[in-house]
Amino acid sequence: MSEAELAALAGEATVDAYDEDEQAMGFHTMIVDNLELPFVTSVLGVDVTVEDIDLAEDNSILAGCARGGVRQAVRVVDLPLPEPPPAGAEWIEAYRHWLG
């Protein structure tokens, strides 16, 4: 996506937000509403299933990853996306762009 497209998505996610906490909540909402779950990706060379998205107490956005009976939260800014990425992954890219 282009810088302009990412900026437009960021603007859409944060349009009614007054501070960084509300902006993070806006991105969380857009990711939850648009990202097609579950999907499989590779984290540290291991295939995991991304099952859900959560907002941490520090307002970072987390992906709930599972393999077998083990679950681990991974910050979406650190989450490798598969090729092709799932529908709605542009919101993760916009969040990464917004964070700088």
Where are these regions (language model features)?
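Preference for intrinsically disordered or flexible, low-complexity segments
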Residues: 1-2, 6, 82-85, 98-100
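A short beta-strand micro-motif
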Residues: 39-43
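Short aromatic-glycine-enriched beta-strand elements
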Residues: 57-64
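A short macromolecule-binding patch
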Residues: 70-79
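Short beta-strand-centered aromatic/proline hotspots
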Residues: 46-54
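Mixed-charge, Lys/Arg-rich low-complexity intrinsically disordered regions
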Residues: 1-38
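Long, low-complexity intrinsically disordered regions
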Residues: 13-16, 89-100
